[in-house]
């Protein structure tokens, strides 16, 4: 029987604790869409080596990331949850893509340009990141890739590379599309910039109550008094309310902002209470899964085998098309 569902693929790098930007921008969609799609979610450990260069840390982060996925509701009976490195074929495909991609094309990537502008030391892995990402996506024949806005260009790169391959070697790859939800495409951090570990403005998805309290209290505010009307559209605390309050409460808070009468202290207290209520059950689920790491390793191992089998079939086609079968 053929599977009529469209194929979804995405992944997150195991570089430490995921933050609420990763969750609302991408990971939540993995859970919400796992019934509708043939969902394949991976732990991007090859990608993580560009920054995590310590074996113990990388394997710890990898198991941690599997726990994170299970805790937010990824169901391994519905979603193929696997480790990227269980499919070494992606490196082979990445090499083939390297050979049909020009340097100037990769030099136009935002992530590369940002790193260069900050004078960061850029290893070849970081420069070549879009190629490996294209291989992750295309080897699985994916239709859609749920990601945050910052990864949109990389999915477009995967499309461009697929087109180039198809033109050069014959029709082999489907052209994937990024799936980005407008309201969460860029989740802001405590300082109002995009939430990102490199800006030090994150709130961890599995934050403790103390961490939540400290992070929210640290959100900078201006000197407007309680009675003064405030603009919710430019307020950092309100941006978080939109993620953690229900619709009724959001509109009540919005009204009080515009009319005046809601001070920043009270707004922060409401946010802290809502965040704690949202995060506590996730943290508890995570702790429960963490009691059986053997089970986690088995899930990854079994799913890794299945994902590799799917990739293997695609690679047979690719090798034939290229002339290395
Ligand atoms: P990474 O940790 O770079 O592998 O990112 C994992 C996923 O989270 C990607 O789909 C990103 O686009 C998404 N993401 C990261 N930061 C944010 C953010 N601040 N807002 C929305 N999505 C984000």
Model-inferred region functions:
Residues 2-135, 287:
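N-terminal Rossmann-like or analogous alpha/beta NTP/dinucleotide-binding catalytic cores
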Residues 14, 145-146, 201:
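A generic structural motif
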Residues 22, 153, 159-325:
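Conserved nucleotide- and phosphate/pyrophosphate-binding catalytic cores
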Residues 55, 145-148, 172, 227:
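Short, polar/flexible loop-turn hinges at active-site or ligand-entry regions and domain interfaces
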Residues 80-83, 146, 224:
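Short catalytic-loop micro-motif centered on adjacent basic/acidic residues
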Residues 103-107, 139-146, 245-253:
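Short helix-capping/linker segments at secondary-structure and domain boundaries
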Residues 111-165, 169:
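Internal, conserved structured core segments that host functional sites
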């Amino acid at each position: 029987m053929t599977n009529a569902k469209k194929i979804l693929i995405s992944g997150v790098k195991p570089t430490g604790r995921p933050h609420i930007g990763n969750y609302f921008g991408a990971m939540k969609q993995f859970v919400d869409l796992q019934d509708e799609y043939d969902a394949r979610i991976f732990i991007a450990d090859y990608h993580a080596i560009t920054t995590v260069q310590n074996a113990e840390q990388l394997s710890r982060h990898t198991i941690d990331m599997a726990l994170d996925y299970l805790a937010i509701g990824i169901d391994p009976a519905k979603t193929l949850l696997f480790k990227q490195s269980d499919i070494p074929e992606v490196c082979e495909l990445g090499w083939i893509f390297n050979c049909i991609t020009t340097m100037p094309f990769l030099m136009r990537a935002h992530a590369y340009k940002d790193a260069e502008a900050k004078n960061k030391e850029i290893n070849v892995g970081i420069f070549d990141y879009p190629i490996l990402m294209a291989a992750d996506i295309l080897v699985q024949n994916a239709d859609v890739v749920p990601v945050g806005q910052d990864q949109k260009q990389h999915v477009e790169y995967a499309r461009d590379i697929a087109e180039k391959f198809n033109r050069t070697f014959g029709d082999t790859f489907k052209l994937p599309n990024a799936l980005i939800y407008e309201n969460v495409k860029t989740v802001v951090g405590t300082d109002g910039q995009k939430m990102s570990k490199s800006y030090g403005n994150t709130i961890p998805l599995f934050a403790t109550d103390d961490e939540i309290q400290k992070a929210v209290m640290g959100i900078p505010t201006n000197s407007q008094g309680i009675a003064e009307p405030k603009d919710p559209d430019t307020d950092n605390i309100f941006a978080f309310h939109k993620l953690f309050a229900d619709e009724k409460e959001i509109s009540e808070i919005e009204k009080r902002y515009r009319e005046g009468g809601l001070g920043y202290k009270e707004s922060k207290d409401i946010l802290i209470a809502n965040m704690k209520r949202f995060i506590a059950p996730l943290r508890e689920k995570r702790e429960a899964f963490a009691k059986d790491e053997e089970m986690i390793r088995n899930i990854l191992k079994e799913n890794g085998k299945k994902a590799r089998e799917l990739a293997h079939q695609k690679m047979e086609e690719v090798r034939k098309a290229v002339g290395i079968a």
